Amino acid sequence: MSTQNYFIGIDIGGTKCAVTYGTDKMDILSHYQFATHTEKGPYFAIDEIKKCLAILEKSYDFTQLKSIGISCGGPLNSETGIILSPPNLPGWDDIPIVDIIKKATNKPTFIQNDANSCALAEWRFGAGRGYKNVVFLTFGTGLGAGLILDGKLYAGTNDNAGEVGHIRLNSNGPSGFNKSGSFEGYCSGSGIAKIAQIRAEEKLNIGQKLSYCESYDELQGITTLQLSKLANAGDADALEVFEISAKKLGYGLSVIIDI
């Protein structure tokens, strides 16, 4: 009889979602990924997750599946299993995701803030092994942190102890969480594009152009993907944007370390 433990991991992000089937030995047996498409509402992504689960149930023996873990940006309530209006998931208001997945699979299901989930995983299986204190940053559509303090996950009263994206690094600057100059405003996928938009508008206002934006009409079309491709090709204007973000990342990390 097999003694292997099998699990499903579900990650719900503002840009993409993922569903994996694996073991507690870090063997990933199946992995699915798809765009979240927040403009289509929460149940588009939820239905896609259900489709992935149905495929997995046909492919593997679910009697050996111990449980399902869901990782999602906060705020959320890990005790009730409800997603509570995350900034990067517009329309995901009071979504009982744990109950939905339980009904679809009849398996124990749990949810945790994405940054906390990542911190736990890295602490147990990755670069954080052997350390009593670990900070893990989620640098995606938004920015958050998971905290391992004195050998335990520190989630705080409402699972939001690591929401460092709110830290203000400058009185003015790109917005994150609708707060100008915030850590997330400078250091996130959406924030990097905002830095570029600000720099481009400053140049256009004095009659100059940047490689990634030659007119005011192009300002809102600037994307982080576009900038990363240019930066990888050595474009100086795009590299300047990433340098600004990188310096703020270092500054933000120094604040967390001091705390």
Please provide the spans of the model-predicted regions.
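Adenylate-forming
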Residues: 118-124, 147, 166-168
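Short hydrophobic alpha-helix segments
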Residues: 32-34, 87, 157
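Short beta-strand segments
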Residues: 11, 69-73, 136-142, 146-148
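Short, active-site-adjacent cap segments at secondary-structure transitions
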Residues: 75-78, 117-119, 144
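ATP-binding/phosphotransfer module of carbohydrate and carboxylate kinases, centering on a glycine-rich
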Residues: 1-67, 77-82, 98-108, 121-131, ...
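Structural signature of FAD isoalloxazine-binding scaffolds in flavoprotein oxidoreductases
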Residues: 160-164
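General beta-strand structural signal in soluble alpha/beta enzymes
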Residues: 109-113
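A charged helix-plus-loop insertion that forms the helical arch/lid used to bind
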Residues: 82-92
